[in-house]
């Protein structure tokens, strides 16, 4: 606020004795050096249309665009002092064609904020005001599976551990009649040696991976999105479902074991090529994959949705039986 800025200016003049409040650059430099303002906050204030730096009980302190993508920022709860991740949009952001065609849903975000689980990211609030829309979640420590796989495939044992956690997360969503709709190596994070967690999009309703207006708060390369698209999405009007989530889990599992996208010629496929691949081509698995694991994956990626696991609970039981499969 202006009152706060004036207070900071008086504090600086009192402590240095030679800073004029008219010297904007010097004042800005000193505010940054004394921790009163971050470089990100200063740059935001200097934009032609400044983005809000205070949203309800939260203060926006830095960008997370390099880590998480466009519109992601780091926030601090001014009452608790905790650091959070925030996805935020201004009115201008929401005028983009993709958002106008498929707008965020505040009701969906409120639903997600009521659902918690040890293997799920935790969304705590959504703020919708005339000039902005923002969602806040606890920050995750670790790295996405996509980054982990750039160093090589997971061991069978580690992949089973990943699946136990992610299936637990998906079961928690499905039990509340929520579909994830964006399961890829970008949405699964390894947070410690023994724990994987699932990131979710709490505010943009799921839609077909082939949709021209597809959008998600989880920044996802198109190739990963298409690689996990269930065969039924080739039919017009097909919406994400529990079965398409299970299919995507199977593709991600195979991806983790191979260390690459588990479909032939994946780097050369266009949209029609991807649709034919999911309808006709068997998924690739490493030759060393134990048969019980391979059997689980094949059930998950069955071309016919009715041939897959019935639900996440049935899949969880199958994974629990894999002890010693490595």
Protein language model features and the residues they cover:
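Conserved HxN/HPN-centered segment at the entrance to the catalytic loop
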Residues: 116-124
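Non-catalytic accessory regions
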Residues: 1-112, 123, 129, 135-137, ...
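C-terminal lobe helix-coil module of Hanks-type protein kinase domains
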Residues: 227-325
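Conserved activation segment of eukaryotic-like protein kinases, specifically the C-terminal portion
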Residues: 216-232
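AlphaC helix of the protein kinase catalytic domain
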Residues: 145-154
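Activation segment signature within eukaryotic-like protein kinase domains
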Residues: 162-163
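Conserved protein kinase catalytic/activation segment
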Residues: 187-203
């Amino acid at each position: 606020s202006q009152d706060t800025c004036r207070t900071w200016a008086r504090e600086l003049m009192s402590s240095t004795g030679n800073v004029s409040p008219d010297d904007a650059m010097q004042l800005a430099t000193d505010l940054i050096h004394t921790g009163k303002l971050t470089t990100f906050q200063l740059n935001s204030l200097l934009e032609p249309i400044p983005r809000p730096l205070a949203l309800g009980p939260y203060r926006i302190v830095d960008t997370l665009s390099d880590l998480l993508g466009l519109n992601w920022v780091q926030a601090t709860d001014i009452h608790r002092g905790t650091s959070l991740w925030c996805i935020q949009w201004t009115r201008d952001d929401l005028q983009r064609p993709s958002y106008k065609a498929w707008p965020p849903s505040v009701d969906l975000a409120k639903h997600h904020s009521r659902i918690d689980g040890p293997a799920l990211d935790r969304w705590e609030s959504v703020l919708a005001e005339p000039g902005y829309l923002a969602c806040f979640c606890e920050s995750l420590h670790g790295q996405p599976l996509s980054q982990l796989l750039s160093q090589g495939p997971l061991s069978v044992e580690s992949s089973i551990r990943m699946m136990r956690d992610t299936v637990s997360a998906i079961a928690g969503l499905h039990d509340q009649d929520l579909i994830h709709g964006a399961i890829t190596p970008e949405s699964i994070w390894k947070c410690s040696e023994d724990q994987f967690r699932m990131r979710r999009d709490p505010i943009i309703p799921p839609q077909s991976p082939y949709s021209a207006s597809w959008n998600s708060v989880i920044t996802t390369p198109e190739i990963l999105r298409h690689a996990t698209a269930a065969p039924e999405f080739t039919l017009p009007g097909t919406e994400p479902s529990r079965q398409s989530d299970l299919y995507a889990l199977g593709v991600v599992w195979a991806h983790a074991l191979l260390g690459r996208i588990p479909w032939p010629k994946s780097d050369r496929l266009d949209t029609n090529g991807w649709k034919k691949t999911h309808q006709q081509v068997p998924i690739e698995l490493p030759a060393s994959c134990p048969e019980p694991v391979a059997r689980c994956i094949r059930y998950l990626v069955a071309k016919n949705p009715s041939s897959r696991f019935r639900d996440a609970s049935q899949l969880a039981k199958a994974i629990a039986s894999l002890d010693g499969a490595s």
